[in-house]
Structures are given as C-alpha cells and as structure tokens.
C-alpha cells in the first residue's frame, strides 16, 4: 500500500554558507552518527553537497510519511546510507515506524550544482490495533 510520496530541492550554496558559519554544529543537527562518520571522511569541497543531499532526502522521506520534519519525525530519525552500488537507502527510527507492519522506502537523489533534489516513495502496511 502506498503510504506517500515526497520531494525536496535544496540550494547547495545555501548549505555552503551555513557550513562556513557553523561547520560542525549544522552537520550535527542534520546528520546521524553513521552519517557524521561519512561526513568526517570528506574533503571540504564535497561536504556541502553531502549535507544538502541528506537534508533533501530526509525532507522528502518525511513528506512521504505525510508529516514533514519537525511534525512527528526529525532529522535524527532518518539515516541516509548507500548500498554497495551507491543506491541511496533510508533507514527510519523504529520509534516512528512501529505502527507499520512493513516498510519499503524508495529514494532517488540527484545533484547538479547549484541544486540537489530528492524524491521518495514510501510503501507499507499498517499494524491492526485490536479493539
């Protein structure tokens, strides 16, 4: 069953400015521990695009759940990783997903300076709550 779709677009220069002012603070606000480990390995020229893509991906996934960031799901509830072939994978905190019997999250990311875009489709089944 389709839970929802979501999309987001981010201006990479906007993220560059924020990272210049708050290099670690902003990254720590947006990224999970797994993502921060990847972020730390990047050279400074790739960090803004990395954060912009993760920001857009998390916004798109949250919108696909029908809530948006800050409306029941937060940046730290969603982790964006890549499989061995580079395909983006979204992991969502079990605190948020426990109402679903299963979830499939499909995520597509693209960037072409000065923008990056994310598109997410969430499929799932709801747990039936006995009355």
Curated annotation (Swiss-Prot):
Its EC number is 2.7.8.7. Pfam families: ACPS (PF01648). It comes from the Bacteria. Mg(2+) binds at residues 8, 59. It catalyses: apo-[ACP] + CoA = holo-[ACP] + adenosine 3',5'-bisphosphate + H(+). Its main location: cytoplasm. It is found in: Cytoplasm. One of its GO terms (cellular component) is cytoplasm. InterPro entries: 4-PPantetheinyl_Trfase_dom (IPR008278), 4-PPantetheinyl_Trfase_dom_sf (IPR037143), ACPS (IPR002582), Ppantetheine-prot_Trfase_dom (IPR004568). Its cofactor is Mg(2+). NCBIfam families: acpS, pantethn_trn. Transfers the 4'-phosphopantetheine moiety from coenzyme A to a Ser of acyl-carrier-protein. Belongs to the P-Pant transferase superfamily. AcpS family. HAMAP family: AcpS. This is Holo-[acyl-carrier-protein] synthase. It comes from Rickettsia canadensis (strain McKiel). The gene is acpS.
């Amino acid at each position: 069953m389709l839970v929802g779709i979501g999309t987001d677009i981010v201006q990479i220069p906007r993220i560059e400015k924020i990272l210049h002012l708050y290099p670690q603070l902003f990254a720590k606000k947006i990224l999970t521990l797994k993502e921060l480990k990847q972020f730390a390995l990047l050279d400074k020229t790739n960090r803004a695009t990395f954060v912009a893509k993760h920001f857009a991906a998390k916004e798109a996934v949250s919108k696909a759940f029908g809530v948006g960031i800050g409306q029941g799901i937060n940046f730290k509830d969603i982790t964006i990783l890549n499989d061995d072939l580079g395909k983006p994978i979204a992991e969502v905190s079990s605190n948020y997903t426990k109402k679903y019997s299963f979830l499939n999250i499909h995520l597509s990311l693209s960037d072409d300076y000065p923008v990056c875009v994310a598109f997410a489709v969430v499929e799932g089944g709801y747990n039936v709550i006995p009355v």
